[in-house]
């Protein structure tokens, strides 16, 4: 691990590069450019930046319209407002006609911290998974967020990318990124731990703690929740016999359910979902809130030992 960078910042800077390479890329925001980091694109390419004001639903409709002109719209806001307030427009105006719109939402999960439960989206992955044809991506670090941004521009169809407010470690290994293909970051024989987003780093740290006790963990970064890498999930569940999923999201509808859907009726194994247990978030320092919901490395390690 090296420096800490938020995935939202990496996304914002990647948009600038992308805009230089592809003149069809346009960026829309809902009066939050300073927070979603689309401010970088606004400064570099003002003629292709559209601030729609506090009108997320309208922003999605505008993005849908721009896509019919051959443009590639990246619509940005907070996850609570994008996946929540604008859900109908995402479903009916973007996904239903299969328009090529990229919905990239920051400030997701309980790590938003002080903003509290009203702004901590713990349902967005589940909501987006439900929409037919919607691709769902959750980058683990800044490098992956950058690669995912470029990949989305090449990908044809509606997609949702979840980004974080909190700055987190950047992995030193420059592993490849391909939509729909999970990355195995650590090999172990005892437990297959599938994680996404900020929780990938916590999963790796938990694996180190458990290794010191003789428990070896495979850590798999599932950056694409939909379509999930079913082959990888099945392979490691069969290999290890114990499966744990870790996500900064409700345990209902997110990564855990996506993994369970793959394994149901195919692989017999112990299974545990670690995430937010059917409750809203609350206000506090990001580190304190993550600990409150059992999402720190030591807590994850303890839960895995309970499973074994």
Language-model regions: role of each:
Residues 1-162, 167, 297, ...:
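Thiamine diphosphate
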């Amino acid at each position: 691990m090296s420096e800490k960078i938020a995935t939202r910042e990496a996304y914002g800077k990647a948009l600038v590069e992308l805009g230089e390479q592809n003149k069809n890329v346009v960026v829309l925001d809902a009066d939050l450019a300073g927070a979603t980091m689309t401010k970088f694109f606004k400064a570099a390419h003002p003629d292709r930046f559209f601030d729609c004001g506090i009108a997320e639903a309208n922003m999605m409709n505008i993005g849908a319209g721009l896509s019919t002109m051959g443009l590639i719209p990246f619509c940005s806001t907070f996850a609570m407002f994008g996946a929540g307030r604008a859900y109908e427009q995402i479903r009916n105006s973007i996904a239903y006609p299969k328009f090529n719109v990229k919905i990239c939402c920051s400030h997701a999960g309980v790590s938003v911290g002080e903003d509290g439960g009203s702004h901590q989206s713990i349902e967005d992955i589940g909501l987006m998974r439900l929409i037919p044809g919607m691709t769902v991506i959750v980058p683990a670090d800044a490098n992956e967020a950058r690669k995912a941004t470029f990949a989305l521009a090449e990908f044809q169809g509606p997609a949702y990318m979840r980004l974080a407010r909190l700055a987190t470690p950047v992995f030193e290994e420059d592993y490849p990124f391909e939509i729909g293909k999970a990355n195995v970051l650590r090999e172990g024989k005892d437990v297959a731990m599938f994680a996404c987003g900020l929780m990938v780093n916590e999963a790796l740290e938990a694996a180190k703690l458990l290794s010191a006790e003789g428990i070896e963990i495979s850590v798999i970064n599932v950056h694409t929740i939909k379509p999930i890498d079913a082959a990888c999930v099945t392979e490691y569940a069969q290999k290890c016999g114990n499966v744990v999923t870790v996500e900064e999201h409700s345990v209902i509808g997110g990564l855990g359910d996506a993994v369970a859907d793959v394994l149901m009726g195919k692989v017999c194994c112990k299974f545990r979902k670690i995430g937010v247990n059917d409750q809203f978030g609350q206000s506090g320092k990001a580190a304190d809130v993550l600990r409150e919901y059992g999402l720190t490395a030591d807590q994850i390690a303890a839960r895995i030992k309970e499973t074994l």
